[in-house]
């Protein structure tokens, strides 16, 4: 199968990450995956939701939205409709869950980190790009707390990233564009850590059921892509990457830092 943009079946779209994109937020990036572009910011708030009060633990939460002309046809802002759509709620909860999975909430203390993801151009994979970019914004925000002396270390247990995979015209493909996703018989979003641990899998048989073999092959394809994405994350965060996951390498400091996936 010849892909629209000429990529191989197991090839990611070009990834560009601009760090510190917003001068006000404690952490921010513009992430570009092909033609999909998302601004991700991390903001620190010195309080927690009511259910976390008195626990000594912090919280990571997310909001997600798309600009009206992020898509080919203008979509009204959801605020004008009075409430977020079901899709928006699903995505922002996914982003929050994915990031909380790698944060030591007890070490964070009773603080909330708000992750805001604003899609400025959508060509497939907006939720996975949001997770990948938000991790970098979150890492920078947490590092600022360390630099201010409010935390002893960055409370991140590992890196985390996400990618889409799917079956289009009988072919298993990595990192689907919008057109590929629209034509997919099966599509999956996979979130994994740099240790190869699975955080979340969202898989749907759009054109009917799919076999366990196809599921496992798609998962392997996603793991291949996420390994490459996390390598890029580590390059972007090269000045603080060795401070992430340090609680897992107290005996042998060479273990996790040298891993790329």
UniProtKB/Swiss-Prot annotation:
Phosphate binds at residues 87, 125-127. It is an enzyme of class 2 (transferase). Keywords: Nucleotidyltransferase, RNA-binding, rRNA processing, Transferase, tRNA processing, tRNA-binding. Its EC number is 2.7.7.56. One of its GO terms (biological process) is rRNA catabolic process. CDD domains: RNase_PH_bact. InterPro entries: ExoRNase_PH_dom1 (IPR001247), ExoRNase_PH_dom2 (IPR015847), ExoRNase_PH_dom2_sf (IPR036345), PNPase/RNase_PH_dom_sf (IPR027408), Ribosomal_Su5_D2-typ_SF (IPR020568), RNase_PH (IPR050080), RNase_PH_bac-type (IPR002381), RNase_PH_CS (IPR018336). GO terms for molecular function: 3'-5'-RNA exonuclease activity; tRNA binding; tRNA nucleotidyltransferase activity. Phosphorolytic 3'-5' exoribonuclease that plays an important role in tRNA 3'-end maturation. Removes nucleotide residues following the 3'-CCA terminus of tRNAs; can also add nucleotides to the ends of RNA molecules by using nucleoside diphosphates as substrates, but this may not be physiologically important. Probably plays a role in initiation of 16S rRNA degradation (leading to ribosome degradation) during starvation. PANTHER family: EXOSOME COMPLEX COMPONENT (PTHR11953), EXOSOME COMPLEX COMPONENT RRP41 (PTHR11953:SF0). Belongs to the RNase PH family. Homohexameric ring arranged as a trimer of dimers. This is Ribonuclease PH. It comes from Caldanaerobacter subterraneus subsp. tengcongensis (strain DSM 15242 / JCM 11007 / NBRC 100824 / MB4).
């Amino acid at each position: 199968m010849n892909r629209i943009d000429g990529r191989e079946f197991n090839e990611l779209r070009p990834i560009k990450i601009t760090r510190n994109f917003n001068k006000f937020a404690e952490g921010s990036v513009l992430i570009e995956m092909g033609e999909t572009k998302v601004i991700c910011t991390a903001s620190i708030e010195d309080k927690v939701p009511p259910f976390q009060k008195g626990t000594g633990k912090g919280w990571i939460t997310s909001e997600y939205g798309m600009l009206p002309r992020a898509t080919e046809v203008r979509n009204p802002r959801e605020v004008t409709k009075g409430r977020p759509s079901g899709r928006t709620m699903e995505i922002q909860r996914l982003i929050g869950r994915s990031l909380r999975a790698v944060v030591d909430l007890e070490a964070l203390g009773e603080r909330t980190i708000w992750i805001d993801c604003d899609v400025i151009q959508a060509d497939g994979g907006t939720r996975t790009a949001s997770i990948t970019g938000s991790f970098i914004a979150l890492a920078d925000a947490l590092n600022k707390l360390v630099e201010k002396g409010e935390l002893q270390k960055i409370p991140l247990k590992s890196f985390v990233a996400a990618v889409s995979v799917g079956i289009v015209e009988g072919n298993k493909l990595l990192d689907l564009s919008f057109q590929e996703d629209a034509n997919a018989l099966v599509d999956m979003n996979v979130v994994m850590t740099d240790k190869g641990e699975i955080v979340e899998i969202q898989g749907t048989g759009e054109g009917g059921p799919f076999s366990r073999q196809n599921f496992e092959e798609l998962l392997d394809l996603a793991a291949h892509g996420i390994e490459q994405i996390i390598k890029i994350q580590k390059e972007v965060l090269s000045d603080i990457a060795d401070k992430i996951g340090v609680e897992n390498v107290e005996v042998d400091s060479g273990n996790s830092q040298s891993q790329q996936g």
